[in-house]
Amino acid sequence: MRISRERYFELYGPTEGDKIRLGDTNLYITIEKDLIAKGDELVFGAGKTARDGLGLLPNVREEEVMDLIITNVVILDPLLGVIKADIGIKDGLIVGIGHGGNPFTMDGVNFVLGSSTEIISGEGLIATPGFIDTHIHWVAPQQVFDALSAGFTTLIGGGTGPAEGTKATTVTPGSWNIKIIAESLDYFPLNFALTAKGSSSRITMEEVLRNGASGFKIHEDWGAMPRVIDETLTVADEYDVQVTIHTDTSNESGYLEDTLNAINGRTIHAYHVEGAGGGHAPDIIKICAEPNVLPSSTNPTKPYTIHTYEEHLEMLMAVHHLNPKVPEDVAYAESRIREETMMAEDYLHDLGAISMMSSDSQAMGRVGETGIRTFQLAHKMKDLGLIQINDNERVLRYLAKITINPAITHGISDYVGTLAPGHIADIVLWDPRFFPVKPYMVIKGGAITWALMGDTNASIAYAQPVLYKPMFGYYSAKSVSFFFSATDGVENLSKIVRRRVLPVKNTRHLTKKDMKYNDILPKIEVNPDTYEVKINGIVPKVPPSKSLPLTQLYFIY
């Protein structure tokens, strides 16, 4: 029996060769492969195939079948590509990408379903890995709600609340503070990794690693001198943890070359490499050309628009406790905000030379906008046409910046960052019309945790008003979420929190070549007087955007 492509779409969703528009952007992904056997699709509902003896195998033990299946969904994943498949989940892990069902009645079955299996209908939806934000200032715990509502399931950073140190730096200093923050975050259904203060004090750094820190943050507000950089990286190398750095904007203790000499070829994650978020003025962006540096942006400068420059001056003064009545403070702020480097940053992202995107939450950036701004930038750069790549490659390049590359960088890619089998089932489902603004459902560790839900006194699930609400997985945080810690701190952190603690690993021998879709090492030159940036000998012309997709249309209500 043959049916039209249009009819197939109505019944089972798109298939191989179909194109899907993402939100109201100019980006159209194309399904590269459909892993589901035609004619044997599993569909839930009255008169459908997901019934006992049909798509569900009877008389089979629980351990032999999936706990959960997401059917006929389009998978958008930096390792798997753009494919159509079922997703099989067991014990909170993804165990199958392919075709689920009953092998006695269906062809091409990769994993078995039975009466113990729950079903989420994925027809017409997109599944991505849960997004990862590597630049979280723990100013307020309520950021968790905004992160979930934007598709984020793993947050990496530091802080203690609205203290001056936290409003400026992603640092949880000292073991006592780590204990307090870990106990507090234990009630929220996301994965967390806490960064402690990088310093010249070895004993202090070893103490925090033994008590649950996952790595270090070097920040100029606490001191980013060459001695601090060297000692922090020395300890990190011994304990296999990552170091993030916000370098010395005022060049007080050295210039970019001095920082690179202190780093001495060792792996480091460089934050907000454009410089508006902080870093050697005016040429920190040149760090993107270093093979041992894993570079990221923060979202306030992305994409560069007609309002970006003006917004940043006042924002910077507030975040870094600067006094507008002190000329030196004003000069410091103005040295960090440069339109020329913002333009270059847009181009470097599209080129694949900046490997990650993050928020800098409540400390210049917005935790709920990282996904939006990432794909606004992809839209803008496709529109400009400076780099000619197909939409699948461009979308996967930008998706990798907020999924697998942050996971690799921080030593947690064995657990999160992809939907590949063996990883934690942190899955975000999207209606393509709302990607990547508002997820349809967030699945955390195999449990539905955050979702759109209607009036709970109504007769059906989606009676107005439909709002994001915590689901049962939210209240089972200890079962579905994880802390990530230095190996030496796993045991002690496990005594503080209820949930499992997993070790970070394989962070110290990474290079830019380990960054998926984002491993380019261009030649970068910065004019110290005009701030003009040349990339591979060319000044890219990236004008500020006057309008963007994924904006007011999605926030009328």
Curated annotation (Swiss-Prot):
Family statement drawn from the similarity comment of this UniProt entry: Belongs to the metallo-dependent hydrolases superfamily. Urease alpha subunit family.
UniProt name for this protein: Urease subunit alpha
Subunit structure: Heterohexamer of 3 UreC (alpha) and 3 UreAB (gamma/beta) subunits.
Record PTM text: Carboxylation allows a single lysine to coordinate two nickel ions.
NCBIfam families in alphabetical order: PRK13207.1, urease_alph
Cofactor(s) it depends on: Ni cation
Chief location: cytoplasm
HAMAP family noted in UniProt: Urease_alpha (MF_01953)
Entry binding sites for Ni(2+) 1: H135, H137, K217, D360
A Pfam match: Amidohydro_1
UniProt domain Urease: residue ranges: 130-557
Top-rank EC class of the record's enzyme: hydrolase
Pathway terms, separated by semicolons: Nitrogen metabolism; urea degradation; CO(2) and NH(3) from urea (urease route): step 1/1
Swiss-Prot/TrEMBL catalytic activity: urea + 2 H2O + H(+) = hydrogencarbonate + 2 NH4(+)
Subcellular location: Cytoplasm
Catalytic activity, EC: 3.5.1.5
Gene Ontology MF term list: nickel cation binding; urease activity
Gene: ureC
A GO cellular component annotation in the UniProt record: cytoplasm
